Every structure is written in C-alpha cells, then in structure tokens.
Amino acid sequence: MPRTDKKENTMTHRHAPARRLTKPAAVALSVAALILPGCSTAPPAAPIAAVAAEQRNPQALETLTQSVYVYAFPLMMTDALQRSALARVPAGRFLHQRSLDDDALPPAVRARADTLASSAFLDLRDGPIVLSVPDLGRRHVWVSLYDAWTDIFDTLGSRTTGARAQQVAITPPGWTGALPAGVRAVAAPTSLVWVVARVQVSGPRDEAAARRLQDRFRLTPLEDFGRPQARDAREIAPPGADIALDAARQRVTALDANAYFTRFAALLKDNPPHPADSTMLENVRALGITPGMPFDSTRHAEAGAQAIEQGAMAARHSLAVAVRQPPVTQNGWFIPRNIGAYGLDYEQRAIVGWDGAGTDLPQDALIARTSTDADGMPLDSTHRYVLHFDRDQLPPQNAGWALAAVGTTRRTPAPAGRRDLLSEADHPRPNRDGSLDLYLQRDPPPKGRRTNWLPVPTGPFIVRMTLTWPKEAALDRSWLPPAVLRQEQEQEQEQEQE
C-alpha cells in the first residue's frame, strides 16, 4: 500500500468512464461480472468460466475470449513498451524528456504541459532495485510506480512523502531480505515495474534547472547499492516516441490468438494478477491459459479454434472503436478521473493502455482538455477566445495550474518569441474584481493583456489544462473549468483598438 504517513495520499477510485467498448466486447465483459467499485453494491455474478472452454459452444467461447483479451491487453502493452524502450536505453536506466517540446516519451507520459518526465522500466526478477530520489527543494515533483498491469501501486514525492531525499528499494513479489540502513522497502506486485518521475517547470527558462534535478535521480540494483555508479543521464533527440508507441501497439494487435495468449501466459508467471481478479482468473483458466505454458487453440474442435480467433479480432476492433469515440464532456471539457488505479474496471484500463498508459492518479495531476468553444464549435486559430474564471472559481490546486494549446495532430510550435504554455508561474494579471481572463489566440493581444496570453498553433487546436495536486473541489466535480468563449467581432475590434 502507498505510504500515507507524510501527507495526503488517497487513491480513491472515481469512476466516470467516458468511453466504453462496443458490442460484442462490452457484452463479454458484463457477462464476466466486472462490477465496478463505487458503481454497484451487488455481489459479483457467477463467472462465465463455469465450464471448461472445450465444453463450450463456439459463441460462448468467442465471448469468453473477448473478455480475457481485454483483461490481458494492458499487460501486453506494458511488455511491448518495455521492449521498445530497451532499444533506446538499457533496463533500469532513465529515459529523460529534456524539454517541454521533446517527444522522447509516449504522449500520455508527456501530456502534462508544465513538467519534464523521466521514464524507466525495471526488471525485478534478479532482485530489488533502489530508487534514489534527491532533495526536491521547493520544486514540485512526483514519482509514480506502475505495476505491469498499469496500475499505480505507490507514489513518491512532494504530495506524499515530502521534499527530503530518500532511498527506496523496489522489491519483487515474495521477496524477503535485509536492506541497508536508511533504505525503505516498497513491495511491487509484479516483477515488471514502470517508473515515471515528473519534475515541474515554469517554462523554457526553467528547463536547465529541472534537467539538473533529473540527473540526480538514480536506479541501482540492491547488490550494487553504495558503490560508485556511472552518471545516469541520457538525452534523446526527438522525434520517436509516437512511432515507438504505435509500433508497440501494432506489435500487440498483430498477434493471432495463439501468439497473444502464449505471450500473456509467459508474462503471468512473473507478473501475478491482483488479488481482486479472482473472478476473471476463472475465465483465464477456463480458456486454457496456464502461466508459463504455450497456448494452443487447436486443441479445440475446428469451430472452437475459429471462435477463439474471432473473439480476439472482435476485442481488438472494439478497443480501437472505443478509443475513437467522442468523450463525454462538461462545459466542453473532458476530465478523466478513473485512471491510474482501476480496480475491476478492466475495460477502462485497456482503453487507457491503448495509448500507452503512463497516466497519473488524479490526486497528482488532473488533466482537462477541450477542442470546442461554448457553442460546440471546433477551436481554430482563425478566431480569438477567452477563458474567464470568476473570482471564486479560480483553478483549485495546491501546486499550480498550466494551460497549453496543441495542434490536433501533434505539438505545434508557438509563434516566434512565445511558448505554447501559460501557467500560474507566469503571474497572469487578474481583473479589478478578482476574476481572471486568459486570452487564447494566434496573434498577440494588446500589451496590457500579454501576461494573460496563450498563443495557439495555426489551424484547429486543443486546449489542455493541468491542475497539479488538485484540491477536493476539482476531484469531486464541484468545480469545473468554464467553457471557452469565442470573442465576437465587436470584441475583437475593441481589442485591436486598445
């Protein structure tokens, strides 16, 4: 369990799924009795794996396959992402995002507009690895530890464990042993662990100081702890991360059912499911999957083998469709909250895993995004916009807010001399009544408004707001970002005359 003796570290699940699988995969999951925590108090229904797979009719076998495929997908993606990362940096070494425009890491990892991220995959099969976190000073930093299923099992840093330097031994499942003095143990649920550290920055001028802090993070095998170690700093020249993510996903989705479930079975050996997954594990066993053993659909009759392949294809298709579905919005903003710790929501976990996971707990960073104005029209640089916060509706957070505008296809550079980021660190000027207006437009506003200006890229764009260490009002939805207002022609003319 995450440590809670220093500061707030709640991991409450707030389920508000914005995208759901289409039938038939959704039917498979509902039949599998995937009761979502907080959404129902009814006891789980009987698992669909009540009889062995070879005794099923083809339709039931296809349904069973879809359920298990979706359940396995995040573990398969973590494995594929690790293999992609190992082509660029050794296991147990950090891959650093060195600037706000650097795309050396997957999109979900670098989605925060005001942080530099460092990513490392750990293989704990040979024993614990010590993570050395430096003194953070006044800078806000957090380190998320993900298991192989993409759930965050611990968070270190400013919000949870404080700013002091610390040494943490990340131990594999079932490990028992002694640790050096001053080293605290964090038990990992799986042997494959993903570490993502985020260092908050106030803009490009602050990047050099943030990079120096990144260079002070260390990962050391326990057996080597205390010995001299080479400097762990690797600068990666963009682009590449999106390609690596796409390649990882394609590697997984290109597998036929036999190859997919054989790899899944191999990963299960060192990356055990969560204790709460007992119902789903009955489905896994009923399909004929045994940890560490090859999967062979041909042991079924021809119709059964075809049903398994069709079930895998249907699950892939349903995941791809679910990712593309328009999200449910409020005031035009999509705010995912049930991420980072998924409980029994295997569907949501798989949908997030499609884009590479790497998301934070909402308690660390709440990210809202919008691509439309208050009238539902797409945001476009041919217009000017205002984001207005009433005095009592300013973004509720403990460690800052940031606003970014990005192109609809990839990060687009801001106009010359400006950055595509506006944050609380810029000290935007409030109105006389205490309210705040932020100007989203391509061309600079009058001089008196430029401290409140977020430059936008040419063409259609998306606005992304990050609340770091959000307050409860943001987490429980009693606060929502206001809709983006398009300035009328008269207002634009008034601005030009100022």
Where do the protein language model's features map onto the residues?
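Bacterial N-terminal signal peptides that target proteins for export
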Residues: 13-28
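C-terminal motif of bacterial Sec signal peptides marking the signal peptidase cleavage site
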Residues: 36-38
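A compositional/structural signature for long, glycine/proline-rich flexible linkers
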Residues: 40-490, 497-498
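Short, Lys/Arg-enriched N-terminal segments with co-localized hydrophobic residues
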Residues: 1-10
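Intrinsic low-complexity/disordered segments
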Residues: 10-12, 490-494
